[in-house]
């Protein structure tokens, strides 16, 4: 599994992985679906346990967005099974998504998930892959800070709206401080685009115009992110 780390806009590399739920072929087994592949430094650790609890709590919200979850660490399959059983018994929640067992670190190395300070532990990385197997976003968090699961949901919803409506979303959407839950138009490409934008849309300048977002999409975004 040698090679450079995959980048946003590239196809997710093909691989077969071992999980607590059986072997999976990536990305082939998820064709037609989005998926979030996220790594964690280790089983039976405090921050990772809170993250898995939150991912499990929001599992149905990811499914509403046609998105599957896949965890990963360099722990063994047995360790994953024991850990999620502990979470179920003590925190009263089921982890129903697969967790990749990568004890030799081959998958983590291929995806650029290994920490600089440690040759064996994975960082808190997130790969968001769309229904065409294209990497749409890559996020990294330090060991000391747990991920915001609502932000990952918001990002997926935004990317799906970009695909559907050919728009772009502002900071903190759907609660932007300037245009609220409206969405932005992408930068105009030609002089004709500039003239059309200023006639058709509201805005502050020819390069900063916006339009109403679909209400159902706004409502869903607010629901899944808890806004």
UniProtKB/Swiss-Prot annotation:
Substrate binds at residue 124. Its EC number is 1.11.1.24. Pfam families: 1-cysPrx_C (PF10417), AhpC-TSA (PF00578). GO terms for cellular component: cytosol. The keyword Mitochondrion does not apply. It catalyses: a hydroperoxide + [thioredoxin]-dithiol = an alcohol + [thioredoxin]-disulfide + H2O. One of its GO terms (molecular function) is thioredoxin peroxidase activity. The active site is at residue 48. It comes from the Archaea. Residues 6-161 form the Thioredoxin domain. Its main location: cytoplasm. Thiol-specific peroxidase that catalyzes the reduction of hydrogen peroxide and organic hydroperoxides to water and alcohols, respectively. Plays a role in cell protection against oxidative stress by detoxifying peroxides. NCBIfam families: PRK13189.1 (NF009668), PRK13191.1 (NF009670). HAMAP family: Peroxiredoxin (MF_00401). Homodecamer. Pentamer of dimers that assemble into a ring structure. Belongs to the peroxiredoxin family. Prx6 subfamily. The active site is a conserved redox-active cysteine residue, the peroxidatic cysteine (C(P)), which makes the nucleophilic attack on the peroxide substrate. The peroxide oxidizes the C(P)-SH to cysteine sulfenic acid (C(P)-SOH), which then reacts with another cysteine residue, the resolving cysteine (C(R)), to form a disulfide bridge. The disulfide is subsequently reduced by an appropriate electron donor to complete the catalytic cycle. In this 1-Cys peroxiredoxin, no C(R) is present and C(P) instead forms a disulfide with a cysteine from another protein or with a small thiol molecule. This is Peroxiredoxin 1. It comes from Picrophilus torridus (strain ATCC 700027 / DSM 9790 / JCM 10055 / NBRC 100828 / KAW 2/3). The lineage of its organism: Archaea, Methanobacteriati, Thermoplasmatota, Thermoplasmata, Thermoplasmatales.
């Amino acid at each position: 599994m040698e090679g450079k780390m995959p980048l946003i806009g590239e196809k997710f590399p093909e691989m077969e992985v071992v999980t607590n739920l059986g072997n999976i072929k990536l990305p082939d087994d998820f064709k037609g679906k989005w998926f979030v592949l996220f790594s964690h430094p280790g089983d039976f650790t405090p921050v990772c346990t809170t993250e898995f609890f939150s991912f499990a709590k929001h599992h149905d919200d990811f499914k509403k967005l046609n998105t599957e979850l896949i965890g990963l660490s360099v722990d063994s399959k047995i360790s994953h099974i024991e850990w999620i059983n502990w979470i179920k018994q003590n925190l009263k929640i089921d982890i129903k998504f697969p967790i990749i067992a990568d004890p030799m670190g081959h998958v983590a190395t291929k995806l650029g998930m290994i920490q600089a300070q440690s040759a064996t532990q994975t960082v808190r990385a997130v790969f968001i892959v769309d229904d065409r197997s294209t990497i749409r976003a890559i996020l990294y968090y330090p060991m000391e800070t747990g991920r915001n699961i609502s932000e990952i949901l918001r990002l997926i919803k935004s990317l799906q709206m970009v695909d559907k409506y050919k728009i772009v979303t502002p900071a903190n959407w759907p609660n932007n401080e300037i245009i609220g839950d409206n969405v932005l138009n992408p930068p105009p490409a030609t002089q004709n685009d500039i003239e059309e934008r200023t006639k058709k849309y509201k805005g502050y300048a020819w390069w900063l115009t916006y339009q109403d977002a679909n209400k159902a999409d706004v409502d869903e975004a607010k629901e899944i992110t808890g806004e």
